[in-house]
């Protein structure tokens, strides 16, 4: 009976996902796993930071377990079919892995940061475009902003990372922060952009030997972000999928409750969950 209930719950989530995706072109975000997202936005299907490997296919980063630590809970075709654009914040394996390299068409449109130009060229992607600052793609405005992937010596090890800001007529402005810690630059971006939606990587990832220097936002930094987010909805992802991420959904939820942050203000997505972005 327990197995039957589990199976029904799994297929129930999948059915809900398919049903919501069948709506006309209403804007939404679906969390696949970790920081991999499907955006239905301005009439386009956009894939963000695809890590498509099966559970345990990538090395451990904290000496705890191989990564990812959980399987993708939806069919691969549901993720990749009809994708028109791929946004890649940076090319660490938890944001663009060997599986994504092998599964995605080499002719798919990719937008990447300047630091990763040679990476996509070397992988044979013929429609990868390096975004320095701003661009127009079809009916979308896309802006790239820098993120800070840690501090001190850890930052030197982690390299460059980026966030993306999406806007289009009649659509909410979406700020995909990418892998970044809380900084004055992020705060200024929010003040300048005034986004309607902020997607934050809140897993509190740490590098072994530098546990006091998080490389993405943890629960405390996420609270700082929420307090500076104005009227934006904050959507938290990048949790419960990697062995070096110490901030779990439960930890973040408890911190939000302690700070009187409502579930309407801070949305903690679960794998396969869809959140409608429409104003």
Please annotate each region the language model reported.
Residues 48-49, 82-92, 111-113, 174-180, ...:
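Active-site neighborhood of phospho(di)ester-bond hydrolases with catalytic His/Asp-centered motifs
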């Amino acid at each position: 009976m327990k197995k039957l209930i589990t199976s029904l719950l799994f297929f129930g989530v999948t059915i809900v996902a398919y049903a919501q995706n069948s709506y006309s072109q209403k804007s939404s975000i679906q969390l696949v796993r970790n920081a991999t997202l499907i955006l239905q936005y301005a009439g386009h299907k956009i894939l963000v930071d695809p890590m498509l490997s099966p559970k345990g296919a990538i090395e451990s980063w904290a000496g705890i377990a191989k990564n990812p630590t959980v399987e993708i809970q939806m069919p691969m075709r549901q993720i990749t079919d009809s994708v028109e654009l791929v946004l890649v914040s940076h090319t660490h394996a938890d944001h663009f892995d060997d599986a994504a390299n092998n599964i995605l068409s080499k002719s798919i449109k990719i937008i990447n940061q300047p630091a990763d130009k040679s990476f996509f060229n070397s992988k044979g992607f013929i429609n990868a475009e390096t975004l320095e600052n701003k661009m127009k793609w079809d009916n979308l405005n896309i802006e790239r902003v820098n993120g800070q992937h840690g501090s001190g010596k850890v930052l030197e090890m982690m390299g460059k990372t980026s966030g993306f800001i999406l806007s289009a007529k009649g659509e909410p402005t979406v700020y995909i922060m990418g892998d970044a810690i809380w900084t004055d630059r992020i705060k200024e971006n929010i003040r300048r952009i005034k986004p309607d939606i902020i997607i934050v990587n809140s897993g509190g990832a740490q590098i072994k030997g530098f546990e006091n220097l998080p490389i993405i936002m943890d629960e405390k930094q996420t609270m700082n972000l929420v307090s500076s987010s104005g009227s934006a909805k904050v959507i938290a992802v990048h949790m419960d999928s990697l062995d070096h991420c110490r901030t779990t959904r439960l930890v973040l939820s408890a911190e939000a409750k302690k700070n009187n942050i409502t579930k309407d203000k801070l949305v903690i997505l679960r794998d396969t969950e869809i959140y409608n972005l429409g104003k």
